[in-house]
């Protein structure tokens, strides 16, 4: 008991000392809500979905606002005009990521592309991912793997026609298979365990972890068990990946190198050498964790949200099915190359990503130096958040912004590449997601086949208005209530 009291006294003194002597940012800062001692504005950001909370606060305090979350000073941008100042005008200045214990422990010292600090090493690895791993050519090269898993999904649905189909569960299973086979071929014996560990990591990455909000208090992740949990997750992931790597190296020694999958591609790059920063196994592992995290939940959530909106909007569903069925009339198999002319389906996907962005708040950026945004002074080391959801539903830029209208993309130059900041499904600038082509290849082929081969109804007499549209609280904003729909087989005549 005495030791406990002593600990409390020491901790209280440390907290008070930190509060009294903490430096306040200088200059003309953006407005924001009043702060409490020590916790700042933390109490105003809990209790709701962050992209909704930030949007509602922005209505009161403006399109750029200052929040103090514990010891971390953040700015939240909620308008396309100011998002452009962040992601384009000041892109190089705000190209860093803030420190994350998850990145440090699980992602091999943040040596990955998603969470790594901006610099020469990061630029090299981003180029490798963009050119060697995730280019359109490489994505096309694994179309056979993608097609096989999608065919398996369609066969499963055929075998269960008339029964409720759990969209997320079954699409997730096939999508995970696509990613594993794309990375490792068929060599992923512990795929289920690997996915479970990655899911646990994602859950721990959700929201604002107290350890990241009070980085000066190094004891927090220790006494809370957060650090030990992350270490356990890292060991699980590393053990599985190390086994895969060792088996592949033995195979390569016997039969030579190839370009069959992404592991071979990256091992070839490692063995060729000649890079400014030699690529180690751990660097490749970090990229693979990025691929899993960025390619699993996001694609599946997009498919589920798209099917949700199609079920809620029967006229849109009918128009989409008519397009697919007219284009593929009589075909028993649909290939990637057949998707080029599905114009209306692409509008549906764009509108889904506008109204239901799977990453509604872009990954945070950190200022490498001071800059100005919206006429305000943004100090060095400030963390910046862009509320992509607020931008893509801003009524100044979008007519009837809360409604699902794929036709709004007719004669529109907006694309998925972040050229206009009112539409940022994958971010923009240097930190834009490099996996757009890979992810969209899965989304398009699955949606096209779901619409071509099957008709869909809601179970148990539900009406379209009964569908719950509440997003989940998580790193990916999928549906809180998973979508279940009933398929019946469409005649291909």
Curated annotation (Swiss-Prot):
GO molecular function: heme binding; iron ion binding; monooxygenase activity; oxidoreductase activity, acting on paired donors, with incorporation or reduction of molecular oxygen
GO BP field: sesquiterpene biosynthetic process; terpenoid biosynthetic process
Glycosylated sites: 209, 411
Keyword set includes Transmembrane: yes
Mode of membrane association: Single-pass type II membrane protein
InterPro entries given in the database record: Cyt_P450, Cyt_P450_CS, Cyt_P450_E_grp-I, Cyt_P450_sf
Binding site for heme: 433
Major site of localization recorded for this protein: membrane
UniProt keywords, alphabetically: Glycoprotein, Heme, Iron, Membrane, Metal-binding, Monooxygenase, Oxidoreductase, Signal-anchor, Transmembrane, Transmembrane helix
GO cellular component, one term: membrane
Entry cofactors: heme
Disulfide bonds: none
Subcellular location: Membrane
Organism domain of life: Eukaryota
Pathway this chain belongs to: Secondary metabolite biosynthesis; terpenoid biosynthesis
Transmembrane segment boundaries: 1-21
The keyword Metal-binding is annotated on this UniProt entry: yes
Membership in a protein family: Belongs to the cytochrome P450 family.
Described function: Probably involved in the biosynthesis of germacrene-derived sesquiterpene lactones.
Protein's recorded name: Cytochrome P450 Tp9025
Protein's organism: Tanacetum parthenium (Feverfew)
Taxonomic placement: Eukaryota, Viridiplantae, Streptophyta, Embryophyta, Tracheophyta
